[in-house]
Amino acid sequence: YYNNMRKKLINLFMMTCVIAGGFTQTSFAQQAKSSNLTQFVNPRIGTGGHGHVFLGANVPFGYVQLGPTEPSRGWDWCSGYHHSDSVLIGFGHQHLSGTGIGDLGDVAFLPVTDANQKEILFSHANENVRPGYYAVKLQQPNVWVELTATQRAGFQRYTFGADAQQAQLVLDLKQGIGWDAAKDYNVDKITSTTMAGHRFSKGWANDQKAFFFAEFSQPVTVKPLGTGRWLIVAADVTKPLLVKTGMSAVSSENAQLNLQKEIPGWDFRQVVADADEAWNKELAKVNIETNDSVSRRIFYTAMYHSMTAPSVFSDVNGQYRGADGKVHDGNFTNYTTLSLWDTYRAAHPLMTMIHTDMLPDMASTFINIYRQQGQLPVWHLMGNETNCMVGNPGIPVLADMVLKGYVKDKEGAYEALKQSALREDRGLGLLKKYGYLPHDLEKTKETVAKGLEYALADACVAKVARMLGKKADAKYFEKRSKSYSKYFDKETGFMRGI
């Protein structure tokens, strides 16, 4: 079995390399023949083991990831969901996927039998999931829960069983995932069919601001329960209760604008169909020719997972919350969830082949983050720099976009590249002073990992400098990029700290 699977994965890898190396973006689209590629996606892959993968409803690169949240039981619950568990505490509107740290889980709804209920048992056998759609049949209360999403809004449909006495939900604004800790939260405005509020938290993202505007398909009464929870009771239990929730990092007014623009009506099935179409459009950019159904499923599932992030981080009116914490008016789509140490080697180069329409805005995002925080993003989450992982991974991503011709403001991009490489923090001061990172002077003792990453980033800066005719800079960074060789130990044949 092991050799069989190993052979399949090697063949799939080789097939991917041939595709990536042999076609332009146009031919990627021309090669796609199936109009229903979402049938080959299995969103459950990666939800067990150490996969940390999000399971729920979202669209490609969406700000909203609406899905089930389980209690945080340790490292393997970073996404808020793990296949080994069978307890739900809510359906939250924002989740991470594939990360090594847990956060988010914002604005969670939970159907309940009474106001004191805080969790529900469920069975994976009763789940139905595909790209853009998640559903689960619950027993206590007896309700069929369905979720779908757009870029900036979530859509829930609760169909209660014939034996249900009331259609009740609890909105939990205190609940979060992993490191997340709610600091300030409230429902600021309530009408018979709407709620608006905010949730500010501190976690992996040091200062996250989430605003929401929720609209109900029928009149509801809302009662505060304390500790960040509100009980919502619908007028008619015999009718499905639909909830549309717009999200924003700027204001609840913007959250309402996002909702009105993206889900103006109440046609749940149409929003599900639109999400499926959005996924098919992106998946159709690559067609693989194989009779191996396992390889096909692995490939399209991996491609699907590659589009959970980066996430849109600006509203339909162009406003976004910047890295300086201020609200900015942008004429571009701003992005966040930039896990760059993980993605600069493969996911971002893939974007330069199949998501070229996103690249000008991605470059603008990087340049504006530099202008607002003084350095290119390292690991950016909800407008916050986490500085997670080593190196300067924002440099190769932006440099690649410049070198491939997707950046209009080349001088602005080069300033961001150069100044990010010339900082003093994160060991860069030692690199400038000694030409390498001395193990005894670098407090994290991660000198080899950092040093190799910095050498690669310096080579990228040098290439852009050379292209722009900045000969002195090119020479300086080319020399600095050779620092990797200083860590090589000829006796052992390995890189070692010095």
Protein language model regions, located:
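Accessory carbohydrate-recognition regions in carbohydrate-active enzymes
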Residues: 30-396, 400-452, 456, 460-486, ...
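Bacterial Sec-dependent N-terminal signal peptides
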Residues: 1-32
